[in-house]
Amino acid sequence: MSITLSRPSLSRPSLSRHPSLTLHSSLSHAPPHHRPVAFLRHPTLRYHHHGRLLSVASAILQDTAIRQDTYIWTPVPISRVLPAAAESLFKVIVDLSRSPDLVYNFVSPGQYVQIRIPEAIVNPPPRPAYFYIASPPSLVKKNLEFEFLIRSVPGTTSEVLCSLKEGDVVDLTQIIGRGFDIEQILPPEDYPTVLISVTGYGMSAGRSFIEEGFGANKRSDVRLYYGAENLETMGYQERFKDWEASGVRVIPVLSRPPPNWNGAVGYVQDVYLKDKPIADPRTTGAVLIGNPNMVEETRGILVAQGVSREKILVTQD
């Protein structure tokens, strides 16, 4: 099973370091470090033709090989598909009212699922794809819905998802990953500076992080560097005012700006370097989401400035 990782225009070109994963170009938000998950139940002991019992370790290895691509799939209906920006960007919302396990196990921003299109909708179906959950966990518990920020790309799962109607049913895996280790930057009084750098549709996890709450209004310097090609590919612009009101300074960064654009231009990591210096690296945290090249470059910059690696959050398997 593989995911193709496209290169968003917001970061310098780089080859994917994760050949075992393929990611549709609309899925630059999916965790680049993800590996297929195997669910190992009680291994069955096997005998070879001489009747000798294979070792438990050997049985486990065999069982793992058989189950290496196994997921637990849950059918869920589409609730709504809404336009999120002008250029083929959509909010896809699924109904979890009959899927309590998905609701219960989504506990941290940065967690994600794989989505599969059933043959009843498209036959043959496109390859399943990974998507960050854009809803904050607390809102999911209340509304019993997952929202995904998805760009429609021809010939992919994303294109089908963005064309579905209310009541259409898709399959979701169990929740994958542990999300962001937010405890590393708590309490807010001890880490008054938090830098959030996001590229492309990584804003799904970014929205979940910001709206779940991390005490932004109790910190003195919280910045969101949000990179996209242009405003037509930048999701959640309608939420920027609310994020600003919560204590997050939003800095849109465009790699292909229109002629009348007066904001930041280029790579988010370069825009950060041109911004005001952080007050104290020892009391600074960061959240990095999106293109692997941006994540690695930004992490390197922050570490060189004295920020602890433990305080630089990325999603966890």
UniProtKB/Swiss-Prot annotation:
Gene Ontology MF, one: oxidoreductase activity
PANTHER family: F9L1.8 PROTEIN, PTHR47215
InterPro entries: FAD-bd_FR_type (IPR017927), FNR_nucleotide-bd (IPR039261), OxRdtase_FAD/NAD-bd (IPR001433), Riboflavin_synthase-like_b-brl (IPR017938)
Database matches in SUPFAM superfamilies: Ferredoxin reductase-like, C-terminal NADP-linked domain, Riboflavin synthase domain-like
Region listing for Disordered, in residue ranges: 1-29
Superkingdom in the source lineage: Eukaryota
Protein name listed in UniProt: Fruit protein pKIWI502
Species for this entry: Actinidia deliciosa
Span of domain FAD-binding FR-type: 71-182
